[in-house]
Amino acid sequence: MPRRREVAKRVILPDPKFNDRVVAKLVNVIMVGGKKSTAERALYGALEVVSQKTGEEAVKVLKKCLDNIKPTLEVKSRRVGGSTYQVPVEVRADRRVSLAMRWLVKYANDRSEKTVTDKLAGEILDVYNNRGAAVKKREDTHRMAEANRAFAHYRW
């Protein structure tokens, strides 16, 4: 953390196809090894599959999907005396979105479909319908925060 001044947030430009910042950010999360065009191809293909299967606008489905997995609470470790407590804290708005995207991509990659496009499309559709591993991750995070509610007074 810098001591002098607050670091300015980088502005992410909207993607060329959908003209949307959320899609551009998700492309950056999917990207591995600087291969942005490959990540774009995978996401655009997945959004195409999603729009065909749902009959709705792909970006709207994606945003609803991300809303379904945004966590509101998480736990952070806090050392008090000799023991470490898992203290529940609220998640900042920007972190909610980034966690949701990371979880979506992580659990999409863990799926058994053949291509990345199919994996992403499958996970987006599952999360849209409140199923899938990413939804389970959000529920587990909330459950963990609820279980450690007794330590909420250690918040900083």
Curated annotation (Swiss-Prot):
The answer on whether this UniProt entry bears the keyword rRNA-binding reads yes
Query: What's an example Gene Ontology biological process for this entry?
Result: translation
> By its UniProt entry, which InterPro entries does this protein fall under?
Ribosomal_uS7, Ribosomal_uS7_bac/org-type, Ribosomal_uS7_dom, Ribosomal_uS7_dom_sf
Q: Name one Pfam family in it.
A: Ribosomal_S7
Q: Which UniProt keywords apply?
A: Ribonucleoprotein, Ribosomal protein, RNA-binding, rRNA-binding, tRNA-binding
User: What's an example GO cellular component term for this entry?
Assistant: small ribosomal subunit
Question: Per its record, what are the GO molecular function terms?
Answer: rRNA binding; structural constituent of ribosome; tRNA binding
The record, for Gene3D superfamilies, names: Ribosomal protein S7 domain
Check the UniProt entry and state the signal peptide residues, or none.
none
Q: Tell me where on the tree of life, at the top rank, the source sits.
A: Bacteria
Stored NCBIfam families: rpsG_bact
| Xref: HAMAP family | Ribosomal_uS7_B
| Quaternary structure and partners | Part of the 30S ribosomal subunit. Contacts proteins S9 and S11.
Family, as annotated: Belongs to the universal ribosomal protein uS7 family.
What function does this protein fulfil?
One of the primary rRNA binding proteins, it binds directly to 16S rRNA where it nucleates assembly of the head domain of the 30S subunit. Is located at the subunit interface close to the decoding center, probably blocks exit of the E-site tRNA.
Tell me what this protein is called. Small ribosomal subunit protein uS7
Q: Which organism is it from?
A: Geobacter metallireducens (strain ATCC 53774 / DSM 7210 / GS-15)
